[in-house]
Amino acid sequence: MTFNVSNATEINTDKSTYLIYAKPGTGKTHTLNFLPGRTLYINVDKSERPLKGNENIDILEFNTHEAWKEWSELMKWLADNKEIINQYDTIAIDNISELFRSMLANLGRNGKNERVPEMSHYQRVDFFTIDSLRFLQSLKKRLVFLAWETNFENYTPAGQQITQAVPDIRKTIRDNVAGLCQVVARLVFNEKSGKRGFILAPSNNVFAKNQLDNREHCLQEDLFKVGDVDDNV
């Protein structure tokens, strides 16, 4: 076995992993129109309409009714078709909240509990989801995972109860998924300006992270324009 060693000056942010989340209909999918280069869009939740007319995005249809088998076959297809995958700069999955639910429903439908998922099904989907995300990162592409938003009740060290906006991912693997990403960004709409933007800095109220630069927020169209800023005002 051999190991590759490289200098930190060679780190390339073009192959980073993003997790963007927001309530349904907020504009998550539209964000993909601002990606540079070519994108392979994995259409899990059938939200492809905001991408209409974009010549740089190819859409891969995904059968959520057979999601458990389909996702496994898709991972094998990606592994076996490097010449196709090498045509793309980005792989986008829209979205992983629905992916988890559809895989769980698929297992429950084929199980022994009258379509209700068994406890073991949750564990299988948890481990399969994380393992497949690791595999996707091995493809050395920019990855963009989209997710819905939910609220999580938490407590500060002082004992104060707070409500935090978080990606709609099972609590058991949420931190693991976020840990595999360089950016976790919450999309919000500003009613006064009429513009959409991303929150990139974590707080008691927002689950977020940004390891690529010093930005704490950005306009929707600037998410993938990585670079430090002098002032975050």
Whereabouts are the PLM-identified features?
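Single-residue recognition of alpha-helix boundary sites
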Residues: N54, A105-N106, S193
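Conserved GTP-binding G-domain of TRAFAC-class P-loop NTPases and closely related GTPase folds
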Residues: F135, N151-V233
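Alpha-helix C-terminal capping segments
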Residues: T31-P36, L136-L139, V226
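P-loop NTPase motor core
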Residues: I93-D175
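Structured loop/turn residues at beta-strand edges in well-structured enzyme cores
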Residues: N86, S138-L139, G179
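Generic beta-sheet signal
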Residues: I42-V44, L146, L187
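Conserved P-loop
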Residues: T2-I93, S97-S102
